[in-house]
């Protein structure tokens, strides 16, 4: 799957998320107000959503398109449907 997505972009985003989660962990130990911690959790969640968009876009641009072009449209549509359902469940 790596060849089908923007891996460099995805890795950059994931490293940022790792930093955000580590910062949240430190905030808990530093007795930071709950509202501030929740704001950072929301930011990390939004960043994960952005990663999901990158993966979904790669899936559509490559996996689904390849399936349709090679005459396996039904399988490509099923794969697309599953990917969209999983992405929607992230919300």
Language model segments and positions:
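Solvent-exposed interaction patches of small proteins and small membrane subunits
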Residues: 1-91
């Amino acid at each position: 799957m790596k060849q089908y997505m923007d891996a460099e972009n995805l890795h950059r985003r994931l490293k940022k998320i790792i930093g955000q989660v580590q910062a949240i962990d430190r905030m808990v130990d530093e007795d930071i107000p709950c509202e501030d911690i929740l704001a950072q959790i929301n930011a990390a969640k939004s960043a994960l959503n952005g990663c999901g968009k990158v993966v979904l876009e790669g899936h559509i641009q490559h996996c689904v398109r390849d399936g349709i072009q090679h005459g396996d449209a039904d399988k490509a549509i099923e794969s697309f449907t599953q990917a969209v359902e999983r992405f929607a469940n992230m919300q």
